[in-house]
């Protein structure tokens, strides 16, 4: 499938987002773009998301890639709002392209049995399934109320069941300095999956020489034409690629 796409010189990949865990939205995106001719989709590494993509395909053939990342990689981060610092200005809500922020000040039941409420004070994602970690909310918050957390998935728990579902590619987002974690996860992926793999990295945290050295080490024992390398800058922001 991928070889055919590349030979046609018309290979378009729709990145639904490693952080996009909204199954309904993913199904709609895949249905729309596959109807328009797209045959390559990048998905969050969750069984329900792969299932949603397959429903969206409605029997059409396509190349499905799931994305995982190292701790701190922007692809797998989620925005959090600190209830103590948030002033409820709604700037983050207005700029969020995913509509992942509905209320800046969250009211939660601290003691449901007593029907008591209190403003949450611990940073946590809002509508986390929709947050893709683009950072636009962070850029407009003047009260330092927004931070990020990285979702650290257990690959041994997640990937085997996705492989059983018949995925076509696994992508490792390795935009960070921790070589130990990068190669630990990369070696595990190579151990359990012998198909197409993709490496996504950038110079944001590495020098150009270090980035090239890492990529060469990662592909050294890979078979020819079974590895995709992307060095495409910061993800999902829709802004300038630096």
Descriptions of predicted regions:
Residues 32-38:
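A short, Lys/Arg-enriched amphipathic alpha-helix followed by its capping loop at the start of a domain
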Residues 18-21, 25-27, 38-39, 45, ...:
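Conserved mixed alpha/beta catalytic, RNA-binding, or beta-rich assembly cores of soluble enzyme
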Residues 47-70, 186-199:
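Alpha-helix-loop-beta-strand connector modules within alpha/beta enzyme cores
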Residues 91-126, 136-152:
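Iron-sulfur cluster-binding cysteine motifs and their immediate structural context
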Residues 4-6, 25-27, 52, 56, ...:
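N-terminal active-site wall of soluble small-molecule enzyme domains
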Residues 85:
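Functionally critical alpha/beta secondary-structure elements and their flanking flexible loops
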Residues 1-17:
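N-terminal amphipathic alpha-helix/helix-capping segment at the start of soluble metabolic enzymes
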